[in-house]
Every structure is written in structure tokens, then in C-alpha cells.
Amino acid sequence: MNSSHHIPKKIRVAHRIKLERCQSWEEGFHVFDEESALAVEMALATGRPLLVRGEPGSGKSQLARAAAQELNRRFISEVITSTTEGQNLLWHYDPVARFHEAQMLAAEAAATALRQENWEEDNQADSEEIPSVPPQPEALSRKKSIRYKKKKILPQKRQHLFQAISAGAGRGFLPDRGSADLHPGNSISPGPFWWAIDCVSARQQIGRCRWPLYQPGFDLGFSLEEAAAQAQRGFVFLIDEIDKADSSLPNALLEVLGNGGFHVPLLNQTVRVPPGFASPLVIITTNEERELPPAFVRRCLVLHLRFDDEHYLRTWWNRQVTQRADQFHPDRALVKWLAERGELHFEHVFSVRVREKAAELLVRDRREAQQAGLIKPGQAEYLDLLRALRNMAAASSEQQQLALLEQISPYVFIKEAQE
């Protein structure tokens, strides 16, 4: 981009950002270019989700983590699978837990009723008039029988207890608190979208829920005041690999993406961003395994991450023109671009020659894989190769590293079955 273009203000461009360990994510580094930084700022300005397209290993998911760190926002992520349901991103309802609660309450109420019945019988037996003459043997045996009955639950009472437990909440055995304990709201867990939109009401709801089915990847011990302070800063919510699910999942998100909120019928409650709180930055990634519904895509801004795209590489090359004596060539530019990324991730670890050699091997294998219609290695594989080289004791000098690259690169770059 030339100097007349808008320069992002909230995201630092060409800056080495160290990413802290987060949930299951390891430490790492990320570098925003102008295009991705500007896309993030536009998503913030419009309130629209940012759909990030690109091949696997191009840094789509990491972009969301880096954005959260740069914007000082809490990071929430959900990796989509073929079994993920759209509603579960909003809220979870657990009917099994509610049924279990009903059974527990019924058993408790039946046991209370049985204890009351035994107590009344005991009082009746104790209040029997004691005769003025010495008791006869038959009377003694009768009193022993009464004492025996006090200590023993009769078979018909056991049957009465079993029937009460089996009947659940429908037989009138529940105490007064039963109707409140069995409210459907006690079985609803806020999903990740709820936390991202309004973490205060989500914090309240998680305190009400008996058996939460979803927990965000951070400490729930904060107070409502702390939750409100967090809500003012906002969240970054990553929906990772949405193309793993069928079209029902993105279609289930049309309301929340279009309106910025959703309704929970069982609570008769609408979840939306409260006044004064920051709207979430929603970043959605796809590897293009499935086509996304047009109505879903229309609600998103779209960023294409194509690091080997000729137009992108030419733009990057032209910004470096004062430092480059060579004429532009796509493969040569990609090698230089990857070598620069390698230095940003492994600062002062490898020489330029080693980083460029690793990049040349990647570019060669990418071209061969593309011609054969196979999976192409990408930026992630390039960084994995350098990481392995750094950690292998046999590669301490530049010459050793250059020799080892040829040996180990197939383990990283060639992933298809060989005939």
C-alpha cells in the first residue's frame, strides 16, 4: 500500500507480537500486515464478524489471538466439529440434569413424608395407657412388637417410598421449593456467544445453573463488578473452522450475527450488548472444505489470507524496493517473505542463508504438490521446520543446519500417502 492509504491505528503493523500461553494455545508470535490489521479495525468499526479465508497453516486462528492481545480484550474460542450445534454456541439446555433434579426432589420429599408417618405412629404407640396391674405375657409380646415396628420400615412403606421416587415431580411429593428448583433456567448454561456479548448476565446465569455444560476458558471467580469492567473492554470470539459443520450451524447464527443478540425462550430473556459495553469482535475461520451459505457470508466482512498470491507478494515487494536490487519474481518474493517471517518468529537464531534455504524447499514442494493436486505445505509447516532445526542438537552450525534441512524437510512438507 502507498502512503495515501489508511494506516491502522489500533493494531501495530509489522510488529513482532509475543502471544502468551492461552487455554490450550502455546506461546507464539504474530505479525500483522496492513491488510489484516485494517480488516480487524473495519470489523470493529462496523460491528460485523470477520470471516477469514485461507488454506490451513496460514495463521487464521492466530490472527484472532493476536487481535485480542493487541486490543486488550478477553479471548474466547470454539473449535467447530461435525457434531457442533449452532444453538450450543448461544446456550445449552440440559433436560437430563433437570430430570435428575426432579427425581432427587421426589425422593427427598417421599423420605420426609415417610419419616413423618413413622413419627406419628411412634407417638401413638407411646401414648397408649399403661395398665395398673402387671402386664400379662401377651401384653409384653405386644409391646415388643410395637418397639420392633418402630425400628423397622415395613415392606408396604418401602413400596410407598419406591413409588414416590418413581413418580418424580408429578405425584405431589415435592416440597414448596420444588417448583423453583425445577425451573428450566436452572438447566441452561450460557454458551460462548453469550459470554462474548454480555458476560455480566452470563456470570449471573452460570451461578444459577446447577450443572453447567459449558465453561469459558478463564477463571469464573470474578465478581459482577469485575465482569462489568471486562465487558467494557470487550471480547474477541474465535469460531474456528466453521466449514467443519454442515450448513445448519452458520444458518443458526444468522440472528445473532445480523442483530447482535439473541433470545432465550426458556428464560424469556434477550441477550444483547448492554449500553456502555463493547461489542465483541467475532472472527470466523474457514478452510473452504464446505461452501458457506450466502446469507451467512453476506453478514460478514471477508479477509483472504493468501501469502503466495502474486498481487499480495508484489505489493509487499514494492514496499521493500529500496532494499531489493532483484527484479520481482513470485517464487523469489515468497522465499524472501518467508525468510522475513522466520526471523520474526526465531529472532537471531538462524542466518539468512538457512532461513532462505528452508523457504526454497517449501516453495519447491508447494509447486510439486499443487501440480499433483495434493495438500500444499504452508507457513505453519515452514515454521515447524525451523523449530525442529532449532531444537535438534545435531544442528549447531550453519553448515550442519543446511545439510539437515534436506534430510528432515520431507517429514514436514510431504504429508500425502506415497505409492
Feature annotation, model-predicted:
Residues 1-419:
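C-terminal regulatory/interaction module of P-loop NTP-utilizing enzymes
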